[in-house]
Design a protein with these regions (language model features):
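Conserved class I S-adenosyl-L-methionine
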Residues: 1-35, 38-46
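Conserved SAM/SAH-binding beta-strand->alpha-helix loop
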Residues: 67-69
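Conserved SAM-binding loop
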Residues: 74-75
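Conserved SAM-binding strand-loop segment of SAM-dependent methyltransferases
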Residues: 81-92
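A short acidic, Gly/Pro-enriched loop at the edge of an enzyme's catalytic core
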Residues: 97-104
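Conserved beta-strand signature within the Rossmann-like core of class I S-adenosyl-L-methionine
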Residues: 127-134
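Core SAM-dependent methyltransferase catalytic element
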Residues: 171-187
Length: 187
């Protein structure tokens, strides 16, 4: 894990320290599905663009990432956008998530299959999950990408079976290099 942290720290040290807010199209495309208030968890938040966007929508957001530098960029972004987020530097391999603690859990461009069950149990009843990351088709254009970090076709629907699917692209189309799921928890 230490090697991963150092790699991400280097990435964010080299990044623009004051980026413009970039809203993830999956989130902005599902505004009608979001509650206007509630608690949100942004996993592998990086420089916190999704966290800041969700805070602007009225959520109390906790942004979690292994990179303290990325989270510092995110706090500055939140301040510039005149909103507030909470941040936590943590190893997502080791982090436990409280049961039924969040109305919304989001995770973009990060794949940790061990988190899947923790993300589901962290959702409150009727809570919403957003997950989007690279799938196996990404390897055609990026053959050096680690194949352990891509989703297989059908993996999301199988992993999140039992949730109410709102939007799902599960890697069937070889021209689409990311898979995503938007699903509601009903317990």
């Amino acid at each position: 894990m230490r090697e991963d942290v150092e790699r991400w720290e280097a990435k964010y040290r080299a990044a623009d320290p004051d980026p413009e807010l970039r809203t993830n199209p999956l989130l902005s495309g599902h505004l009608a599905d979001l509650y206007s208030v509630g608690s949100a968890l942004d996993l592998a938040s990086g420089s916190c663009h999704s966290a800041v966007f969700l805070a602007q929508q009225g959520y109390d957001v906790l942004a979690v990432d292994c990179s303290a530098t990325g989270l510092a960029i995110g706090r500055r972004l939140a301040q510039r956008e005149q909103t507030t987020i909470r941040t936590l530097t943590a190893d997502l391999d080791e982090m436990t998530l409280d049961k039924e603690a969040y109305d919304l859990v989001v995770c973009f461009r990060y794949l940790n299959r061990a988190l899947f069950s923790r993300m589901k149990t962290a959702l409150k009843p009727d809570g919403l999950l957003f997950l989007k990351t690279f799938n196996v088709h990404h390897l055609a254009s990026s053959p050096k990408f680690n194949p352990a970090y891509v989703l297989q076709s059908g993996e999301l629907s199988q992993s999140f079976n039992g949730m109410v699917m709102i939007d799902l692209n599960d890697g069937e189309d070889p021209k689409i290099t990311q898979s995503w799921i938007v699903a509601r928890c009903w317990q």
